[in-house]
UniProtKB/Swiss-Prot annotation:
HAMAP family: Ribosomal_uL24_B. Pfam families: KOW (PF00467), ribosomal_L24 (PF17136). It comes from Trichormus variabilis (strain ATCC 29413 / PCC 7937). PROSITE patterns: RIBOSOMAL_L24. Part of the 50S ribosomal subunit. GO terms for molecular function: rRNA binding; structural constituent of ribosome. One of two assembly initiator proteins, it binds directly to the 5'-end of the 23S rRNA, where it nucleates assembly of the 50S subunit. One of the proteins that surrounds the polypeptide exit tunnel on the outside of the subunit. The lineage of its organism: Bacteria, Bacillati, Cyanobacteriota, Cyanophyceae, Nostocales. This is Large ribosomal subunit protein uL24. Keywords: Ribonucleoprotein, Ribosomal protein, RNA-binding, rRNA-binding.
Length: 117
């Protein structure tokens, strides 16, 4: 009997969360720094404020209304961003450590700065 294809969505572990400050390390916006607006774990992508801006031409919806050109951020792959320390202005990889209370937190490898409070 053939097995059914698994149609449940896969969630990938992302190293960034909504609200993190990141630096783009690859692509046309390389070097730009911005805040993560939204994380999309099913696609392994993130939306970063001010990065990967796309223009969309919107048709008029009602009679008498004129069309518009809307600019908005498009998702970029999470592997193309790196966490950024605003205190020391440096991008760093992330590692996971435990606090004295036993809570698992994210820590920047270069600076030792703890991200999760």
């Amino acid at each position: 009997m053939p097995s059914k294809k698994d149609t449940t969505p896969k969630f990938h572990k992302l190293h960034v969360k909504t609200g993190d400050t990141v630096q783009v390390i690859a692509g046309k916006d390389k070097g730009k720094v911005g805040e993560v607006i939204k994380a999309l774990p099913q696609l392994s992508k993130v939306i970063v404020k001010g990065v990967n801006i796309k223009t969309k031409h919107v048709k008029p919806q009602q009679e008498g209304e004129s069309g518009r050109i809307v600019t908005q951020e498009a998702p970029i792959h999470s592997s193309n961003v790196m966490l950024y320390s605003t205190k020391q202005n440096v991008a760093s990889r992330v590692c996971y450590t435990f606090t004295a209370e036993g809570k698992k937190v994210r820590k920047l490898k270069k600076t030792g700065e703890i991200l999760d409070n």
